[in-house]
């Protein structure tokens, strides 16, 4: 806890989110913008709000987020992971419900590297019989 803020770091793909929560009225600010202005897709907004709605804290906290790297989906996942960790920092009794929903575990899937001699990570050149 930093002052009256609770902190959590979230990661997803190449995105990293630093999340600070404190008691408030439900404002979420991402990189200085309201969440609805920062994330253009409705699914991204839904992903970010999942841990708050699960724990019935949607209108309980003001949240400030700094997120870098990755694209929109990766950043939304990183923010969700950070909010989850900050909620656990605030109240450890929330951990079992968040863990059962799968929000505590970091999604370790990363982009597979491109291999030499292939078009992409696994896509080979088209085979020609003749």
Curated annotation (Swiss-Prot):
Name the record gives this protein: Small ribosomal subunit protein uS9
InterPro entries xref list: Ribosomal_Su5_D2-typ_SF, Ribosomal_uS9, Ribosomal_uS9_bac/plastid, Ribosomal_uS9_CS, Ribsml_uS5_D2-typ_fold_subgr
Protein family membership: Belongs to the universal ribosomal protein uS9 family.
Transmembrane segments: none
UniProt superkingdom: Bacteria
One cellular-component annotation, GO: cytosolic small ribosomal subunit
Ribosomal protein in keyword set: yes
Gene3D superfamilies the record matches: 3.30.230.10
Molecular function per GO: RNA binding; structural constituent of ribosome
Signal sequence segment: none
Keywords: Ribonucleoprotein, Ribosomal protein
GO BP annotation list: translation
């Amino acid at each position: 806890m930093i002052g009256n803020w609770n902190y959590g770091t979230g990661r997803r793909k190449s995105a990293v989110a630093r999340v600070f929560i404190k008691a408030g009225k439900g404002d979420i600010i991402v990189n200085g913008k309201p969440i609805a202005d920062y994330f253009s897709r409705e699914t991204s907004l839904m992903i970010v709000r999942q841990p708050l709605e699960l724990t019935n804290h949607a209108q309980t906290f003001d949240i400030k987020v700094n997120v870098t790297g990755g694209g929109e989906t990766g950043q939304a996942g990183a923010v969700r992971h950070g909010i989850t960790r900050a909620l656990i920092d605030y109240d450890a009794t929330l951990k079992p419900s968040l863990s059962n929903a799968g929000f505590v575990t970091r999604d370790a899937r990363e982009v597979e590297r491109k291999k030499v001699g292939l078009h992409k990570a696994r896509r080979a050149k088209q085979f020609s019989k003749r």
